[in-house]
C-alpha cells in the first residue's frame, strides 16, 4: 500500500498545489472536470462550480490539462526515480523481462 501512495500522493499534491485543471474519468465512463482541492487515502475533493467528493475506487484515470512536475522532495529520496512516462517505461520493462528470461 505504501508503494502505491508513494506514486499517487506526490502527483495529486502537485496538481493540488499548482491548481492544475484536471479531467477525472470514472470507471463507468463519466468525465469530471475541475481542480483538486484536497485528497486522502480514499477520496479526492474536486472543485468546479461545486465541490464533489470522488471515491478513488471509482476513478479510472486522472488527466492533467498540462504537464506537472510531480517528483517527490521527501527525505526518503529515491521516489522520483520510480516515475516512468510513455513508451520508454514500457520498453525498459520489456527489455528487463527479456534479459531475465535469458
UniProtKB/Swiss-Prot annotation:
Lineage: superkingdom:
Bacteria
Q: What is the effect of changing residue 16 to A?
A: Almost completely disrupts the ability of Hfq to form condensates in both growing and late stationary phases
CDD domains on file: Hfq
Indicate yes or no for the key word NAD: no
Matches recorded under Gene3D superfamilies? 2.30.30.100
Residues of the Sm domain: 9-68
- Say which family it is in: Belongs to the Hfq family.
Q: How does it assemble?
A: Homohexamer. Interacts with H-NS.
Q: What does this protein do?
A: RNA chaperone that binds small regulatory RNA (sRNAs) and mRNAs to facilitate mRNA translational regulation in response to envelope stress, environmental stress and changes in metabolite concentrations. Involved in the regulation of stress responses mediated by the sigma factors RpoS, sigma-E and sigma-32. Binds with high specificity to tRNAs. Binds sRNA antitoxin RalA. In vitro, stimulates synthesis of long tails by poly(A) polymerase I. Required for RNA phage Qbeta replication.
Name of this chain's protein? RNA-binding protein Hfq
Lineage from the top down?
Bacteria, Pseudomonadati, Pseudomonadota, Gammaproteobacteria, Enterobacterales
Amino acid at each position: 500500500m505504501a508503494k502505491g501512495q508513494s506514486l499517487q500522493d506526490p502527483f495529486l499534491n502537485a496538481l493540488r498545489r499548482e491548481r492544475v485543471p484536471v479531467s477525472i474519468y470514472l470507471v463507468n465512463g463519466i468525465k469530471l472536470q475541475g481542480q483538486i482541492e484536497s485528497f486522502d487515502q480514499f477520496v479526492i475533493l474536486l472543485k468546479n462550480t461545486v465541490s464533489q467528493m470522488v471515491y478513488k475506487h471509482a476513478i479510472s484515470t486522472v488527466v492533467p490539462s498540462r504537464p506537472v512536475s510531480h517528483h517527490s522532495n521527501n527525505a526518503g529520496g529515491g521516489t522520483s526515480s520510480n516515475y516512468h512516462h510513455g513508451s520508454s517505461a514500457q520498453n525498459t520493462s520489456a527489455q528487463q523481462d527479456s534479459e531475465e528470461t535469458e
